[in-house]
Every structure is written in structure tokens, then in C-alpha cells.
Regions:
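Non-catalytic, mostly N-terminal accessory regions of nucleic-acid modification and defense proteins
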Residues: 1-89, 149-152, 157-160
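Phosphate-binding glycine-rich loops and adjacent basic patches that engage nucleotide phosphates
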Residues: 11-21, 39-48, 98-102, 121, ...
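A short, mixed-charge helix-start or loop-turn motif at secondary-structure junctions
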Residues: 64, 119-120, 199
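Conserved S-adenosyl-L-methionine
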Residues: 68-175, 180-182, 187-189
Length: 212
């Protein structure tokens, strides 16, 4: 448990994010995990091996969850396609529905592959209503060596709030919008400067339905 606190002490963006109890795991399992990761064969693989391992288990986790809020993690192949089309190079990148942070990871990798340093060239901002998903995002960014500002909770509900006050200030906005979200209150959204083209269909309850 102290190990997690020591990690948080070294990374401001992970403060309050990491789990602080491992009572669900036996000492034998934890010892075996340490033995596996403390293996020279892993070092020999090179590259961002820890980040790739994290992504592997994150994808496994994503396949086993579903939510009435329409929350799901965008497949890596789709994220990669979006990034390759937009080709981010430098500046401010916002994902207003960032989930586990896939857009940031692939954008960072794209920038690094071009010979630049992603943390120097890019500034990452994210909004994620579900706090647990925002924690996954911050951990995902950390194991890939990226920094960013992620806001979560009601203030980060992108249907109603520009949590970072970035209207007109972003170089890139990437997102896989939460199309399944229903009952968005039109009155709380229609005054947003981020919606210059107006609102989609509003029903008799003054709500916007999902995108299906």
C-alpha cells in the first residue's frame, strides 16, 4: 500500500487516483506479479512495454463491462485511424468524452514517432463524467509517460459544461461522442457557445434523445 502512495508523491496527476488497498489479492499473487515484472526478458523487449501491457488488460476489462449510460471504450484501431487522419503535431488537444484516454495515447505515440516529445509539443485536456473512467485515463497516460489535465464528475459533463474553458482555444478536438446517452436537457445545453449550429431534435419534454 505504501508503494502506491510513493508513486502518487512523485506524480501530481495521480494524486488520489491509485488504489490504496490490495486486500483482494493474496501475498502469493502479489509476489508472483512482482516476479513476472522483475524479469530481464521484459526489458529486452524494449519500447513502451508497460504501457502495452496496461492497454492489453484495459481492453480485456472493456469487453466485460457495459453501462446504461452508454459508456464504452473506443477500439484502439478506430482511435488510431482518427489520429492518423488528423495528424496532430503540436498544440492543445481536447477530448470532451475521453473515457480511458485512448485519443491521448495514440496522439502522443504519433507525435513521438515523428521525432518530437509529446509532452513538450502537446497539451492534453480531457473531460469524463464517470470518475472511475477518468482514473483509468490518468493511469493510462502515466504508464505511457504522458501528462494532462483530466476533469471528471458533473462539472465534466460535456453536454452542459466546457470544464476547461477552452472554447475557441483548441488546436485539435478528438472524440468518439457518447451517442447512446439519452435525455440531455436542451435548456441546459442550447446556450453553449460550443454549439453554434444549434441543437438536434428536441422532444416534448425539452430533451435531446440519443444518436441511434
Amino acid at each position: 500500500n505504501n508503494a502506491m502512495q510513493l508513486i502518487e508523491d512523485q506524480s501530481e496527476q495521480l494524486t488520489g487516483v491509485l488504489p490504496n488497498s490490495y486486500t483482494d489479492f493474496s501475498d502469493e499473487i502479489l509476489s508472483e506479479l512482482l516476479r513476472i515484472f522483475n524479469n530481464s526478458a521484459i526489458d529486452e523487449v524494449g519500447g513502451d512495454i508497460v504501457g502495452r501491457i496496461y492497454e492489453y488488460f484495459l481492453n480485456k476489462f472493456a469487453k466485460n463491462i457495459a453501462s446504461d449510460d452508454g459508456v464504452f471504450f473506443t477500439p484502439k484501431s478506430l482511435v488510431k485511424m482518427i489520429v492518423n487522419i488528423i495528424e496532430p503535431k503540436s498544440g492543445v488537444l481536447l477530448d470532451p468524452a475521453c473515457g480511458s484516454g485512448g485519443m491521448f495515447i495514440q496522439s502522443g505515440d504519433f507525435v513521438n514517432q515523428s521525432g518530437m516529445n509529446a509532452n513538450s509539443a502537446m497539451t492534453f485536456y480531457g473531460q469524463e463524467k464517470v470518475e472511475y473512467n477518468a482514473q483509468l485515463c490518468l493511469m493510462n497516460m502515466a504508464v505511457h509517460g504522458l501528462t494532462g489535465v483530466i476533469k471528471s464528475g458533473d462539472e465534466a459533463n460535456t453536454f452542459y459544461h466546457d470544464a476547461h474553458n477552452l472554447d475557441g482555444s483548441c488546436d485539435y478536438v478528438m472524440a468518439n461522442p457518447p451517442f447512446n446517452v439519452d435525455k440531455v436537457k436542451a435548456e441546459s445545453s442550447e446556450s453553449a457557445k460550443r454549439l453554434p449550429f444549434g441543437m438536434p431534435g428536441v422532444n416534448k419534454n425539452k430533451e435531446v434523445g440519443n444518436g441511434n
